[in-house]
Amino acid sequence: MIEVLVNDRLGKKIRVKCLEDDTVGDFKKVLSVQLGMQPSKIVLQKGGSVLKDHITLYDYEVHDNTNLELYYS
């Protein structure tokens, strides 16, 4: 189990517990419950690159305490 930090453009930080082998799509579902919005409206970036739903967090080198940027579509 890892904890990922998600930051939106307004300075809000959200901590999300997940597994490294979760897909980005799975991660968005967990995050959407905390945000109260549809997973399809969430866009996540790491280092300026948009994360694709079918790829795992591990493949994007997302580990414990990694920071992701949150945007809304």
Swiss-Prot record:
The keyword Transcription regulation does not apply. Keywords: Ubl conjugation pathway. One of its GO terms (molecular function) is protein tag activity. GO terms for biological process: cell morphogenesis involved in conjugation with cellular fusion; mRNA cis splicing, via spliceosome; positive regulation of RNA splicing; post-translational protein modification. Pfam families: ubiquitin. Residues 1-73 form the Ubiquitin-like domain. It comes from the Eukaryota. InterPro entries: Hub1/Ubl5, Ubiquitin-like_dom, Ubiquitin-like_domsf. Gene3D superfamilies: Phosphatidylinositol 3-kinase Catalytic Subunit, Chain A, domain 1. The keyword Hydrolase does not apply. GO terms for cellular component: cytoplasm; nucleus. This is Ubiquitin-like modifier HUB1. CDD domains: Ubl_UBL5.
